[in-house]
Structure formats: C-alpha cells, structure tokens
C-alpha cells in the first residue's frame, strides 16, 4: 500500500511533463509498496539542480491516472487503492446490476401516502437567474471531464446564460434519450476507513460535467423548497432537510440527551439501535424511485427527466467506461435530495407496518423516537420480548426497497452493560456500541471521560505547534478557529447543556485561554468562554421546533439570544489583516514554505 502525507504537494525539479509524471506515479501504484518506494527514491535521486523547471503536482488531483482518497487511520494520510482498476469496475457493476428493477413494486399490502399535494408542474422550469446564481456562487477551481471550469464559466456567464437555460428547459420538456456526454460521470474513490485491502471500503464519488452539475444543483434547490413548503419530508425524523438550523447538531444532541438520561436513571426499559444500511446510495432502485416520485405527484416532467437520465448513466473509472442500473450518485446535490425522499418513504412504510403487525403499540410515538440524518438512522424502542419482531419488520421493509441492513455495523445501546451482543433466531447478531463507536462523526457522550481525554491530548499538541510558528497573532488565531475550535465546539456545547460543567472542560478552557491570551485575545473575554458556549448551544435549542420542548427541563429561558455567541464567532472567525478570504488564510502557511509543518499539523488533529 502506498501512502502520501495529507495535503503535501509533490515538488519535482525536472523537465518531465505533467502527463509523464502522472504516468510514472500510476506505474508505481501498480506494484508492491516496498518496491514502489525504492523506485520513487531512485528516481528522485537522479534529479539534478540544473533542472529548474518546477512542476507542482497536487497528488489529490490525479484523478483518472492515480485515484487517491482520505484515510481515517491514525496517521491521516492519502491512501491509494492497490487493486487493479478492472477489479473496482467489476465491483461497481456488480452493485449496479445486483438487484431487480421493480417497474411497479409489488408491495403487500402496497403502501400509499395519506396526503398528496397538488403541485404546479412548472416548478421545474429553470430561469436565467437560477443559472447565474449557481455559477457565481461556486468557488471551486477544478475542471470537469470536458475541461470546463466554474472560473471559465464566470467570465462568459452573461453571454451564455440564455442559451444554456433554453437548452436546460428543452431537456426537461423533451421525451427522447439523453446523449452519452450528458449522462457520463467520472468516478473517484474515497476511502471509508477499515481494511484498505477490502474493495468495499472505497466509496465511489461521482464528478459530473459542470453544465450537468449546475442543472443538478438548480433542480435540487427547487425540489428542496417544495419538500419544505408542503411538509413532504417528516422533519421530526429526517433532519438532513432542515433549514435555518443544524440537523446534524440536533440529532447528536437529542440522541445523546436521551441516552444519558437512560443511563443516569438506570432505565432498563429502552434500547437504542444504530441502523447501518449497506451501500445505501448504491442500492436505490430506479424503478422504485420512479414509483415514489409518481406517488408524490411532483411533476411528470421531473419524473420523466429522472427516468431518462438515471436509466442511461454511465461512469468512467480511470478512463474505463462502465454502466450500472441502480444507485444514485454520491457527490450530486439532486441525488442527495432524491435519496432523502426515498428513505422518508421507506420509514413511513416501516412505521405503518410495525404498528399493524403489533410489533409496536399503536400509541408509541415512532416519529419522536426515530432519528435520521440522510442514511444514518437511530431508533429508540422498548426493550422487551418484541425486539426480534421489530428488527424483523425493519429488515423486511428495507429489503422491499432493495436495501439491506448491515447487522455487522448495526449497534445497540442499553443500560445493562453486561450485555455485549444480541442474537436473534434469524441469525442476525448486533453488538453493543463501544467507546470507539461514532454516531454522525461523534463519540457517544456516555463515554465522556474517553472523549475529553482524547481532546486534551490532541489539542495540547496542536496548540504548541501553532504557537511555534513565526506568524502574526491573527493568523494563529484563525488557524486555531478553523482547525481546532470548529472541531470541538459542538462537543463542549452539547456536553455543557446535557451534563453541565465537567472538570475536563475546565482544563480544556484553561489550556485554550493560555494560548489565546498569549495571542492577544482579551483575557476578560476568555473568562466567559464557557458561558458563551453554553449560551450558543441554548440558542440553538430555543430556535429548533424539534428541541424547544426541552427548554424547561434544561432551564433555558425563553428570552435567550445568541448575540454573545455571535460576538464569540466574530472574535475567532474574523479575517486577518493579511488576507480576507478563508482559502487565503489557510494557504498562508503553504505560501511561506511551511509545507512540512502544514502536513504534520493536519496529520496530528
């Protein structure tokens, strides 16, 4: 396995062209790591000082030649797949073609929505303003498979907008097949962690042609507005669709709040199930998705576009083309919205069947006790003899829609700590969530001591590294804010609200205060550091329709405002005198030839 340090660019003093260098890197990727490293060192050793032409090749951009992705191991490095590209294409194709396409799903009994709004089908019509808004608000510099970039498009947006928008609307009005160029996508691999030799640990990420991506974003935005306006998605359950509040924050808080209450009260009557769906996006069935879109009566034009587009998509992985017959794009705004609609429909079906089958009492509020954020699902159920029947309904319902619950990654939590696993008669076995389990990227707060010990150890190392830099205080504060504060603030906010103060929180605050006052943050402000965090978290609860019910229990006043929290953000999030934009701030270290520190700093967080 060949590893490359995170965010380190390859600086090669050579006359090799960029394409030649890509081919060289590709060639060493196909051989064992020890031999590849020897060859790379030998090659670099032959370079002479006379070759002054510098090629700055960012490893992460070598997409088709040498796909690499984020590795969540302790060393935090980019990881290159060792398997041949043909093997990965075979894997993607097997996923895509492994499920029957249900032209008209045979539900038994068939599930139907209780309410279907009457939409104006012209909501899908795209305007010039829609097009310009998407183009001008994108800051990415990368080029698509046809060598088009947003930067280039911005320079000609006024002259091409009318033409492009007219073609978009022609596509939506049309009935014929879409061309291959429109339905093509480059596929990158993103390592999900775990065993790097397991081909399933590399997630396929789609990079659409830019003009397709723009239409994709416009339709996603319009569809999102429809979902919110007509309350189509059950936002008590699915939080990924929320606006003006953080659904991620809400779910992390709510699940941990109820779990901590269960543990504190020694309540043995409840059990939490963290449900993992195997290859969730890849198992969305096109026929079923089309049925759901038609059941919602969104728009015949939109449903027709879905059919014409998704039934013709093909991917390019390392310049080899393949086609699949199931699965939504990961990396597509529209696919994300469609997936949320798909999961919402499944959960509504599941809730009905759980009550009709008697697995759950009719009065049990499944909406109140189910939390979804895209495909991350938590269900709080009664811990009794009907657990097996409930899990059977859950598994069966997902299977109807072409999905599968991954029992190896579905965990539970209950008060009785002597129970480490549960096995049912259908051979499904579920393990207890441990202190290394992550829900939405966050450790469970019942393991608070482990959480704070890890934070303190890593934070001290990072603060010391920032302090050693010969940079202005403003830059140091910004690096702290963007790369440390934003990673720990949610933990402290939520823990402070649920548990109150904690000795380790005080130690963390003292550690931060020592360095930030050294970097000219007012000491008087730092003394209220924790108060601001608590107020900020309280304001989030007060603003959330789903969490507002907890305000009396948590002693959060109705009059709470977050002006102080905003002041807090302003102090740490302000632009530095040297640079105005976020990107320029974060690139400061690179521009000052501190690549080695930059890499080491990132790898330690």
Predicted regions and their residues:
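Short amphipathic alpha-helices in soluble, non-transmembrane regions
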Residues: 390-396
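Basic, alpha-helical interaction scaffolds
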Residues: 427-498
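Catalytic palm active-site di-aspartate
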Residues: 144, 184-187, 203, 237-242, ...
């Amino acid at each position: 396995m060949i590893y490359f340090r995170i965010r380190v660019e390859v600086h090669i003093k050579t006359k090799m062209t960029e394409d030649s260098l890509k081919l060289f890197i590709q060639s060493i990727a196909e051989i064992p790591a020890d031999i590849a490293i020897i060859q790379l060192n030998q090659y670099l050793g032959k370079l002479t000082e006379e070759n002054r032409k510098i090629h700055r090749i960012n490893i992460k951009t070598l997409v088709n030649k040498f796909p690499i992705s984020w590795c969540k191991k302790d060393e935090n490095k980019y990881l290159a797949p060792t398997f041949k590209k043909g093997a990965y294409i075979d894997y993607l194709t097997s996923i895509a073609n492994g499920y029957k396409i249900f032209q008209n799903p045979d539900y038994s009994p068939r599930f139907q929505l209780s309410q279907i709004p009457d939409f104006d089908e012209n909501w899908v019509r795209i305007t010039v303003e829609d097009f310009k808004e998407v183009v001008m608000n994108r800051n990415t510099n990368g080029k698509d498979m046809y060598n088009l970039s947003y930067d280039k498009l911005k320079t000609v947006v006024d002259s091409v907008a009318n033409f492009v928008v007219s073609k978009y609307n022609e596509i939506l009005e049309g009935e014929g097949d879409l061309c291959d160029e429109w339905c093509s996508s480059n596929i990158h691999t993103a390592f999900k962690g775990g065993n790097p030799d397991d081909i399933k640990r590399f997630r396929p990420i789609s990079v659409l042609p830019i003009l397709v991506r723009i239409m994709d974003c416009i339709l996603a935005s319009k569809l999102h507005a429809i979902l919110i306006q007509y309350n189509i998605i059950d936002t008590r359950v699915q939080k990924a669709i929320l606006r003006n509040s953080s659904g991620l924050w809400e779910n992390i808080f709510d699940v941990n709040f109820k779990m901590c209450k269960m543990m504190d009260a020694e309540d043995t009557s409840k059990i939490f199930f963290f449900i993992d769906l195997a290859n969730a996006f890849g198992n969305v069935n096109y026929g079923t998705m089309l049925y759901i879109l038609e059941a919602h009566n969104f728009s015949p034009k939109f449903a027709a576009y879905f059919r014409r587009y998704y039934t013709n998509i093909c991917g390019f992985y390392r310049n080899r083309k393949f086609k699949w017959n199931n699965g939504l794009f990961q990396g597509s705004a529209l696919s994300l919205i469609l997936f949320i609609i798909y999961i919402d429909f499944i959960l509504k079906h599941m809730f009905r069947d759980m009550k009709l089958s008697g697995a759950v009492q009719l009065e049990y509020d499944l909406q109140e006790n189910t939390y979804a954020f895209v495909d991350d699902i938590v269900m709080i159920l009664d811990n009794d003899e009907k657990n097996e029947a409930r899990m059977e309904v859950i598994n069966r319902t997902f299977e109807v829609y072409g999905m599968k619950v991954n029992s190896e990654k579905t965990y539970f939590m209950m008060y009785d700590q002597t129970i480490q696993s549960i096995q049912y008669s259908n051979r499904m076995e579920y393990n207890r969530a441990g202190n290394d389990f992550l829900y939405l990227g966050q450790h469970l707060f019942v393991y608070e001591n482990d959480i704070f010990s890890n934070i303190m150890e890593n934070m001290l190392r990072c603060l010391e590294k920032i302090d050693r830099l010969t940079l202005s205080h403003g830059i140091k504060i910004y690096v702290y804010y963007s790369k440390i504060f934003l990673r720990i603030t949610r933990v402290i906010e939520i823990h402070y609200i649920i548990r109150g103060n904690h000795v380790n929180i005080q130690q963390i605050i003292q550690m931060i205060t020592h360095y930030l006052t050294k970097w000219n943050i007012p000491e008087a402000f730092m003394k209220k550091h924790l108060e601001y965090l608590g107020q900020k978290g309280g304001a989030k609860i007060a603003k959330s329709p789903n969490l507002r019910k907890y305000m009396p229990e948590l002693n959060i006043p109705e009059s709470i405002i977050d002006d102080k929290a905003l002041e807090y953000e302003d102090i740490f999030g302000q632009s530095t005198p040297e640079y105005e934009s976020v990107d320029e701030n974060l690139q400061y270290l690179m521009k000052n030839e501190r690549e080695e520190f930059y890499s080491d700093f990132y790898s330690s967080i």
